[in-house]
């Protein structure tokens, strides 16, 4: 199918369909969505979640306390927002059941650039997936999306409709609009003259989906929400005639759907008054002498915390406060999820194919998240950041607390302050374009751009110093360690095999040393007594500064014996035990001087040296670095390595 046929097919599928009222009622018997409220239809569009048993994955089990969590494919690209999405779905479920939430404003509260607008756009987009049914008369569709049930009286007609068509009583009760009331009068009460149109909600055409934004005190009035008289029609109709009214307000257009109110609490208070009755009573008054207008939809509002705090602290606004269902949308606090956000943003730009050195996005996400975290008590903020990403630090930081302990101490407002994803992405844009020749990103340029931007932003002194401390006290030393390992592993061709050999040898020596037995090397025939074994073990332990060798050796041997039981009697991988992996790496790379001739970009004295250097560069490029980045990062590493 070519693009033109595909477009035509899509256009035809979205066309309105017209039914008689009898056909519509028959449809209601088989299809509940024909009379479902806005929350129900939105739930249909969101679809069923994928249930994830976090007990099956160690990282997730630490974050979600072994709970079974719901993940919704409709919100797949909203990373680190499980709690906010779950609360939104909870609101919709309760509203769909006709509970108090049906009468409340769904209010997304969060910091700038935290994803509130993106969530709102996704909800509006999902609303387009399920059609609505609207009254029509004489070929004209109701301008306020009157549902056909507005024609029926709950007291008089509910019993018959429930008996004949299985329509629950609670779906009746929506008032008739002035437009529908006028047509009913013109038809002499004959409701069969009405038609019902199946319409697809549309953001573009503002069908059941509307958006309103705050203006200033002087030029915004409630007509933005409720509409006003269309002066062009006064030539033909009286001022209080329903047909003289322009149903252009956001509440008019969003009936049976969703109305988004951007930065709601920036709007003058008088503009918000129609929302009170629209939510609680399902109707509101227009600006002229016409009867009340129906509203049976969702009001979705969002704003930053400062506006909410100002609004909440004003005692005159108590009526609103009781009608708001707050969903907090904080910044992402997990490194792995923040990285996915950056990758998503990059994928929607020309930089999607630009080289990005390993560690760049991770370093930026760490910086962003550190700025959002509250300082913990008796623990390192860096450890807290790692715990928030689901890491277990019991072997590396005895002072680290559990995820829940950190959360409890930080309180409910953690993640509501700090640097936004927008700020981070602007930084990333500058990093990619830092070099005038090569469009690529690497952490060294990132450090420079971040330091420069901290000065430019003119943060309060204490805050700026805190950000610089994150950079110089943690991120730069950590990256120096990371790039050092990258360089060293690229230098050692048989890195993995070499590491496993040291691991196996260490375990064997330690086992015989603990048992106080001599050991004969099967390959060389050399005999090691307990003293010789101790000397060999110390060669591996000393570069890592192991302070209690006896306990360390017992710990390692016990770990390996347990692991062998689950590994057909074979030793585990040398990287499987964090403590010993660190020890082995430090042993392997304790003498970096021999690296220098290979990794430096100076002129080589021999062909052999040049070949080793070229092989090293090729291996670094296989890891994801460009040739230019290899040179930059090696020179940076050689310059800073002795500082840490």
Over which residues does each language-model region extend?
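Long, basic/Gly/Ser/Thr-rich N-terminal segments
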Residues: 1-40
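Conserved ASCE/P-loop NTPase catalytic core
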Residues: 32-644
């Amino acid at each position: 199918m070519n693009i033109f046929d595909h477009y035509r097919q899509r256009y035809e599928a979205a066309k309105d369909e017209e039914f008689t009222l009898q056909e519509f009622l028959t449809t209601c018997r088989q299809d509940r969505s024909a009379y479902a409220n806005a929350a129900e239809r939105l739930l249909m569009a969101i679809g069923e979640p994928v249930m994830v048993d976090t007990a099956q994955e160690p990282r997730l089990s630490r974050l979600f306390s072994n709970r079974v969590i719901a993940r919704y494919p409709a919100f797949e690209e909203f990373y680190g927002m499980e709690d906010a999405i779950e609360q939104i779905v909870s609101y919709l479920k309760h509203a769909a059941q006709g509970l108090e939430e049906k009468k409340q404003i769904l209010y997304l509260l969060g910091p700038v650039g935290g994803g509130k607008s993106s969530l709102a756009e996704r909800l509006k987009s999902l609303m387009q997936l399920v059609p609505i049914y609207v009254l029509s008369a004489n070929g004209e569709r109701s301008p306020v999306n009157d549902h056909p049930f507005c024609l029926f009286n709950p007291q008089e007609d509910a019993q018959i409709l429930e008996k004949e068509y299985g329509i629950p009583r609670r779906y009746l009760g929506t008032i008739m609009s002035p437009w529908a009331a006028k047509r009913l009068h013109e038809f002499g009460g004959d409701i069969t003259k009405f038609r019902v149109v199946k319409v697809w909600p549309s953001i573009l055409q503002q069908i059941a989906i509307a958006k309103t934004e705050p203006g200033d005190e002087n030029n915004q009035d409630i007509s933005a929400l409720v509409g006003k008289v269309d002066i062009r029609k006064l030539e033909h109709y009286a001022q209080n005639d329903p047909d003289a009214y322009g149903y252009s307000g956001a509440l008019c257009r969003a009936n049976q759907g969703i109305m988004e109110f951007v930065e709601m609490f920036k709007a003058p208070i008088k503009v918000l008054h129609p929302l009170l009755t629209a939510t609680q009573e399902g109707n509101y008054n227009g600006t002229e002498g016409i009867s009340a207008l129906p509203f049976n939809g969702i009001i979705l509002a969002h704003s930053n915390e400062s506006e909410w705090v100002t609004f909440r602290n004003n005692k005159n606004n108590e009526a609103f406060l009781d009608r708001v269902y707050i969903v907090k949308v904080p910044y992402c606090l997990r490194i792995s999820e923040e990285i996915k956000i950056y990758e998503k943003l990059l994928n929607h730009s020309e930089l999607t194919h630009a080289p990005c050195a390993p560690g760049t996005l991770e370093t930026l996400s760490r910086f962003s998240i550190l700025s959002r975290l509250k300082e913990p008590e008796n623990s390192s903020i860096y450890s807290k950041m790692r715990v928030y990403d689901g890491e277990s630090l019991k072997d590396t930081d005895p002072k680290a607390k559990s995820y829940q302990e950190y959360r409890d101490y930080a309180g409910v407002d953690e993640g509501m302050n700090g640097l936004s994803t927008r700020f981070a992405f602007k930084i990333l844009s500058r990093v990619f374009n830092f070099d005038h020749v090569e469009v690529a990103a690497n952490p060294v340029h990132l450090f420079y751009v971040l330091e420069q931007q901290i000065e430019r932003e003119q943060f309060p002194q204490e805050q700026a110093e805190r950000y610089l401390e994150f950079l110089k006290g943690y991120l730069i030393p950590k990256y120096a360690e990371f790039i050092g390992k990258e360089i060293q592993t690229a230098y050692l061709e048989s890195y993995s095999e070499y590491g496993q050999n040291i691991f196996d040898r260490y375990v064997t020596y330690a086992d015989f040393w603990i048992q106080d037995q001599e050991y004969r090397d099967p390959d060389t025939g050399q005999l090691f007594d307990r003293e010789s074994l101790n000397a060999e073990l110390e060669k591996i332990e000393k570069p890592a500064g192991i302070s209690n060798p006896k306990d360390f050796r017992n710990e390692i041997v016990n770990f390996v014996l347990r692991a062998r039981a689950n590994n057909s009697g074979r030793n585990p991988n040398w990287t499987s035990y964090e403590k010993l992996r660190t020890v082995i790496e430090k042993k392997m790379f304790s003498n970096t001087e021999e690296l220098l001739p290979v990794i430096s970009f100076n002129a080589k004295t021999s062909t052999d040296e040049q070949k080793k250097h070229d092989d090293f560069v090729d291996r670094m490029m296989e890891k994801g670095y460009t040739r230019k980045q290899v040179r930059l990062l090696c020179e940076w590493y050689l310059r800073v390595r002795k500082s840490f």
